[in-house]
Amino acid sequence: MRRRRSRVEGAARALPEAVAALSRCLPAGPSPEIFRRAKFDRPEAAPVLWQLLLRVLSPLAANNTWTDLAPEAQACVVKSALGSQGYPRSVLLQFPDGSSQGSRELLLALSWLLARGPLLEQLLAQTRVQLGDQLPQWEAPTSPGPPAPFVEPKSPVDLRLVEWLMGRLRFRWRCLISSQQEQCILLSKIHLYTQGCHSQQSLGHLSVAETEMLRDPESGQQLLQALESENIRLEAALEWRRRELVFWQWMDTVLDTCSPETPAVTSQPTFLPEISEGGLGELESVKQELQALQEELREVSEPRRAAWEARVGGLGQGPEWSNSRKALQEAVQQELAALQGSWEQSSTPGQPQRPHRLVRSKDGAPRPQGLQAAEVIRTLSAKEACLKKALHQLQRQCQQELARLAGALPGLIWILPPEH
């Protein structure tokens, strides 16, 4: 009897500990009491969960950029983010923006985000304290996949608007490049001036954070507090992984408390049309008309096809056709070789898939273990060459299409835009 009672008490303590560990992992995580109230759909838990989902779904909210928004705007951002990620429950989207309803649905949305991907790992990576100057994380694209299907726009697109958007994009891209160049110059100066000041021989120089600690000792205390907070989050993540099963068992009970009027996956009702007896006769007459049209089309197309085959029957032979066929085969082989080369370059394991610390090394010194800047530049240059080649090919295709359209419309003059 005592053993059974202790087992029940242990299971009762495991759930609050699991929820508390999850709360410590999340940014500005709510208390476990909020989770308990959300299970019973209490209205006081809804505002806290709206803010939590905003911080989880929006990278800008981590910097307190969107936390000052009105509750209606926060709810709109959360709904659009969940919809873009394919959230299956439409019940949450039906609640009015900024209302205190649907705390249980918000809890289900949070659990869906936790179950579908490495959410905690991404949040921990965003709040990680950086002690060294690191190379920004980037991922080499692998196979681009099939092209996206063409979607006809609902309204005509103004060409001036497209040109204006392209101009804004180019301007922001140039601003980004100039800021990156300025940052690289400042980093190089710091690494050069602090050469030989680091205790580790493999590094040799100080980073920006370490230089800031020497310049302002109070920032060292802030950095220490940030490291302690990060350790607390990492310990909470480890505890969450040990007690995760208890939380998901509890979420099963939360899902069971949902009313039958709000099923897990809503679907549009299907209506079958009713066909009367008169409609069957009309369908039969339409079928006969279609068959007659098919026979007429076959009678017209067969003579034309025979005449076309007789006209081109002697073509495809001779030295000119063999030379053109050989040129086409060589072009196809070159294109396949270029595609294979870009695939091999994008799938090499030596490319950076995580942040790397920037270390200044002297000429002729032994290379440390890590990623060299020359390798990154070489990879990016090869990728740039492949993209430029694809761009030139698309431009040629567009020019050929414009020439074809100009030939089809003799009364229209096509004026190409000036090259930039």
Curated annotation (Swiss-Prot):
Subunit structure: Interacts with TEDC2. Found in a complex with TEDC1, TEDC2, TUBE1 and TUBD1.
Keyword Repeat: no
Segments forming a coiled coil: 276-340, 377-409
Pfam families: TEDC1
Protein name: Tubulin epsilon and delta complex protein 1
Entry keyword annotation includes Lipoprotein: no
Principal place of residence: other
InterPro entries hit by this protein: TEDC1, TEDC1_dom
Organism annotation: Mus musculus
One GO process term, biological-process aspect: positive regulation of smoothened signaling pathway
Chain's role: Acts as a positive regulator of ciliary hedgehog signaling. Required for centriole stability. May play a role in counteracting perturbation of actin filaments, such as after treatment with the actin depolymerizing microbial metabolite Chivosazole F.
Subcellular location: Cell projection, Cilium; Cytoplasm, Cytoskeleton, Microtubule organizing center, Centrosome, Centriole
Transmembrane segments: none
GO cellular component terms, semicolon-separated: centriole; cilium; cytoplasm
Disordered: region residues: 342-369
Skewed-composition ranges (Polar residues): 342-351
Keyword annotations: Cell projection, Coiled coil, Cytoplasm, Cytoskeleton
